[in-house]
């Protein structure tokens, strides 16, 4: 009787073993079936091999300077610029592996030990997601499924995708891909943006404790936000450092030392409207959109069929030099702050009841304000929302809180309360500026400053704005005369009243221009001396002899696109031109008569480095080498004995105007410089075009409206408003020898039959002009 239970126990054990294997096999079969179904797409869409090869990740377009630095980006929601594994520091990779997946380099996408641990301890001792699984979730299964069953299916899909990723990519590629994809919030998409935004540096320059902060954010970037939860982020950083020590990536001593460090966040937000070269970047936006319209995208499966500058991760290689751009922006800011201060001083309500406008009656002032009001964003929005003109006008007289531009603030902004109409008048009191700098031999634009502050002044005065050129147009007249009439810089003409009769050259009535000071010396002036001092009577004689038509033809060949009437008055600079055109044109003189179209973009690549666009230079032979050199020689006279002499002398340091607005004076340049100042009617525009052998730079300063200007020529001339910006910019350029800005003589042609070596008497007269220029407070600079 005692043996019966043993038989029963044996039978029960056999049944247990049988059912165990049945259940095990069934479970294994179900698991395999689930994986197969997931792999075949029956549990929801799975990425194809093509999508795994070319995932549609939104990438920002990066704008790269000629010296390899990032000028800015174009993006919508994802400010992401990928980096390769080689660009990641070892401490960042080590922190990632130690914290997120310690056996990363040992498994094939799924960590069996980690998965078993997570099941046994229900996740209490850490999750089981590998880096590859986390990447698959970021790329293909972002949405968290509801319910237990849904979550299980999603997890299975992540496992399948992770295995596929491991088969198609190296471990290093997956790490880079993961870090490039993760959203670190605060507009920091991917490791490069995160590194730049939180620490102001490239990923390769991250210190160990900084890498630990970013890796700590991978657990939950919203929770571990360095800008809002510093203590929580600090604790998380120290946890990451502890993991690194646990897995021998750093020593215990180093861990303890790093954990003692305070948080050192250097928040540097990135925005389309902030940073360096904002106006240039906005120009590029239009350039790229035009390029996209003409170049269809060869779309792969699942991709867009049109290039998108905000999503496709293009790399745009530009000609702008980061250092020179910085020098240019600093020069504009430094001078415009001082110039604006004086302009405010001269336009107080007590001194000018119609400020910022001069010499306008109330009706003319109202017309300007009315036009500005109707062109404002506020008017357009309210009109689009169905508001009546009466309602809109009423809103412009209601005080409201606003943030406006302010030179006196470190952020160039201040909060205030004023009516929208008052804000329009306030902004019109600011003088505007534009500057472009170009290598004449290549056409490469090295610096581009379209205004004071793009956020508040979005009109680009380099290429959008066209203003009267004043005396900076005169070199085109001189070039035509030397080219067509075979004159030389040493030929002389009298400074006396000169009239072109009615009916000649299309004149409806006699044209008898005056010199800027209203006087005629009666003396003979060489062309060099006449251009240096902007003698209008000599220029009038030249355009009469050569005719307006050849002058216009040369200007067009030099790249001027705007309308130029074929009438004599153009000789004194009445045409409206922009800085972009003027720099390109003047570059021809330095480049031995060959016009090179200014270029801003040399190459465009896709996210994989495939070249999509490469610039082909556009050139045109316009002038002979002799004529071009003669023109450069003429304009050297401007800085030797004319309106540009303040670049060289230091004798006026105690004069009031020099103290107030000639920023940075004395400059004391000793190297060869060719240039031309320009001032238009009523001092509405001030120009300076400056040239050295390998750099041509144009500067314009003026009000938004021509009625916004200085009252006197002393302050309102090109030599006061624009020339100091050029001088400050070049001083900074010369201080950086790596830029290689030339201080040499302008190259002379091998054969030169045009006389440029004027007599000793002529040179003495130039020196006399220079002395008179200093004593008379640059009265000879009047160059309408």
Short names for language-model regions:
Residues 1-64, 339:
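N-terminal type II signal-anchor transmembrane helix
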Residues 33, 68, 96, 135, ...:
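Residue-level preference for non-acidic, small/hydrophobic
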Residues 38, 98-111, 122-127, 165-171, ...:
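Bacterial peptidoglycan biogenesis and beta-lactam-recognition machinery
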Residues 121-145, 204, 268-280, 487-551, ...:
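Conserved catalytic neighborhood of penicillin-recognizing serine enzymes
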Residues 251-319, 323-387:
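Non-catalytic structural connector segments
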Residues 322-338, 371-439, 444, 448, ...:
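A penicillin-recognizing enzyme superfamily signal
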């Amino acid at each position: 009787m005692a043996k019966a239970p043993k038989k029963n126990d044996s039978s029960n054990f056999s049944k247990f073993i049988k059912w165990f294997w049945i259940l095990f096999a069934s479970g294994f079969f179900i698991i395999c079936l689930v994986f197969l179904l997931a792999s075949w797409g029956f549990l929801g869409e799975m990425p194809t091999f093509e999508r795994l090869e070319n995932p549609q990740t939104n990438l920002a377009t990066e704008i790269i300077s000629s010296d390899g630095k990032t000028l800015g980006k174009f993006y919508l929601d994802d400010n992401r610029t990928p980096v390769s594994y080689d660009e990641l520091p070892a401490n960042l990779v080590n922190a990632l592996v130690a914290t997120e997946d310690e056996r990363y380099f040992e498994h094939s996408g799924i960590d069996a030990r980690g998965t078993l641990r997570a099941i046994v301890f229900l996740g209490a001792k850490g999750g089981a997601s590998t880096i590859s699984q986390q990447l698959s979730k970021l790329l293909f299964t972002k949405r968290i499924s509801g319910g237990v069953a849904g979550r299980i299916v999603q997890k299975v899909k992540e496992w399948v995708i992770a295995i596929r990723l491991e088969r198609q990519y190296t471990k290093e590629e997956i790490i880079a891909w993961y870090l490039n994809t993760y959203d670190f919030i605060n507009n920091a998409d991917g490791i490069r943006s995160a590194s730049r935004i939180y620490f102001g540096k490239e990923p390769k320059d991250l210190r160990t404790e900084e890498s630990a902060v970013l890796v700590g954010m991978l657990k939950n970037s919203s929770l571990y936000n360095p800008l809002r939860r510093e203590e929580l982020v600090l604790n998380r950083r120290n946890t990451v450092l502890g993991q690194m020590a646990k897995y021998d990536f750093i020593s215990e001593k180093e861990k303890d030392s790093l954990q003692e460090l305070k948080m050192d966040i250097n928040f540097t937000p990135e925005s389309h409207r902030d940073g360096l070269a904002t106006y240039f970047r906005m120009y590029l936006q239009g350039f790229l959109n035009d390029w996209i319209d003409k170049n269809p995208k060869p779309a792969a499966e699942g991709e867009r069929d049109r290039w998108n500058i905000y999503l496709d991760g293009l790399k745009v290689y530009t000609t702008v030099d980061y250092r020179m751009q910085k020098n240019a922006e600093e020069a504009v800011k430094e001078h415009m702050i001082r110039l604006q201060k004086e302009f405010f001083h001269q336009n107080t309500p007590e001194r000018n009841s119609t400020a910022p406008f001069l010499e306008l009656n109330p009706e003319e002032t109202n017309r300007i304000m009315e036009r500005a009001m109707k062109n404002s964003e506020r008017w357009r929005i309210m009109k689009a929302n169905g508001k009546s003109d009466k309602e809109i006008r009423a809103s412009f007289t209601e005080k409201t809180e606003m943030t406006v531009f302010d030179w006196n603030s470190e952020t160039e902004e201040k909060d205030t309360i004023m009516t929208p109409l008052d804000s329009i008048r306030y902004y019109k009191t600011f003088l505007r500026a534009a500057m472009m700098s170009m290598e004449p031999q290549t056409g490469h634009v090295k610096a581009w400053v379209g205004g004071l502050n793009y956020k508040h002044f979005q009109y680009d005065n380099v290429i959008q704005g066209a203003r009267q050129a004043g005396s900076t147009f005169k070199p085109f007249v001189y070039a035509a005369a030397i080219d067509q009439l075979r004159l030389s810089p040493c030929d002389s003409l009298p400074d006396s009243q000169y009239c072109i009769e009615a009916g000649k050259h299309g004149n409806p009535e006699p044209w008898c221009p005056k010199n800027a000071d209203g006087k005629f010396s009666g003396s003979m002036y060489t062309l060099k001396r006449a251009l240096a001092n902007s003698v209008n009577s000599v220029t009038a004689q030249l355009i009469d002899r050569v005719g307006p038509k050849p002058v216009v033809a040369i200007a067009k060949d030099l790249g001027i696109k705007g309308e130029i009437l074929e009438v004599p008055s153009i000789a004194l600079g009445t045409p409206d031109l922009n800085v972009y055109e003027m720099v390109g044109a003047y570059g021809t003189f330095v480049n031995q008569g060959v016009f090179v179209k200014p270029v801003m973009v040399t190459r465009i690549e896709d996210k994989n480095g495939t070249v999509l666009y490469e610039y082909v230079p556009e050139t045109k032979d316009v002038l002979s080498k002799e004529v071009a050199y003669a023109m450069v020689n003429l304009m050297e006279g401007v800085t030797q004995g004319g309106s540009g002499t303040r670049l060289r002398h230091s004798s006026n340091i105690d004069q009031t105007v020099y103290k107030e607005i000639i920023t940075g004076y004395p400059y004391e340049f000793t190297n060869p410089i060719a240039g031309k100042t320009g001032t238009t009617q009523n001092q509405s525009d001030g120009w300076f075009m400056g040239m050295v052998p390998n750099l041509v730079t144009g500067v314009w300063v003026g009000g938004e409206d021509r009625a916004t200007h200085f009252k006197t020529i002393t302050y309102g001339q090109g030599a006061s408003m624009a020339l100091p910006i050029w001088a400050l910019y070049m001083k900074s350029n010369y201080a950086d020898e790596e830029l290689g800005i030339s201080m040499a003589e302008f190259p002379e042609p091998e054969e030169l039959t045009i006389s440029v070596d004027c007599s000793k008497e002529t040179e003495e007269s130039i020196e006399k002009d220079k002395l008179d220029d200093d004593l008379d407070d640059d009265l000879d600079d009047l160059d309408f």
